[in-house]
Regions:
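Short beta-strand edge/turn micro-motifs at domain boundaries
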Residues: 2-5, 10-11, 27, 119-121, ...
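Ser/Thr/Pro/Gly-rich low-complexity linker/stalk segments immediately outside membranes or between
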Residues: 28-42
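Single-pass alpha-helical transmembrane signal-anchor segments
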Residues: 10-25
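Surface-exposed, charged secondary-structure patches
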Residues: 87-135
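Short acidic-aromatic low-complexity motifs
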Residues: 39-66
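Short, solvent-exposed secondary-structure junction/capping segments
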Residues: 61-79
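A mature extracytoplasmic/lumenal domain signature
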Residues: 77-79, 108, 124-128, 145, ...
Length: 171
């Protein structure tokens, strides 16, 4: 084996190692974890058709578990301030159970992250396609979520519906 071939092989091994380390850093980064937490919340809020009560309560329970102790939810003009887990669960369940289908996509995500303090603010626009009793609709909302790192997980500390942008309400 020539010196040139050995150098190419070592260069390839080094490049693969650097790529794997970069991938690991990205996957484990707080930035990525916050975005995944939002993706999870959106997926749990969605539904494609009728749900049995056990599935509906299970999804509601999983959604409520994404909120930190001492959370605050503000969804004006649809709801007042919510700080109680049982009230939050009832509101989420009522909104989800009233819909035949909910599909959520988001855009314009902007994340501000302070790793040292373990806090983050994520603002975005949520586009919600819904079907309530055969009446399909689409609405868009500007949302701000303050996240807090709690026991290694990113949880919602403050959820605010900042602005209703367009469409009919799914609340």
């Amino acid at each position: 084996m020539s010196l040139g071939e050995m150098l190419r092989r070592w260069w390839l091994v080094g490049a693969i190692a650097v790529a794997l380390i970069a991938l690991l850093v990205y996957v484990r980064s707080d930035r990525r974890r916050v975005h995944r937490a939002l993706d999870r919340a959106e997926n749990l809020m969605e539904k494609a058709g009728a749900e049995d009560q056990l599935s509906a309560f299970g999804n509601t329970r999983k959604l409520v578990a994404l909120f930190a102790p001492g959370f605050l939810v503000r969804a004006r003009p649809y709801e007042g301030a919510i700080t109680d887990l049982q009230q939050l669960a009832a509101v989420i369940h009522r909104y989800r159970s009233g819909a035949t289908a909910l599909r959520i996509s988001d855009r314009e995500r902007k994340l501000e992250l302070n790793r040292e303090l373990g806090i983050a603010t994520l603002t975005f626009v949520a586009d919600v396609d819904s079907d309530y009793g055969g009446s399909p609709g689409r609405a868009s909302y500007r949302i701000r979520i303050d996240w807090v790192r709690h026991d290694g997980a990113w949880l919602i500390h403050d959820f605010e519906l900042v602005e209703v942008l367009a469409g009919r309400s799914w609340w």
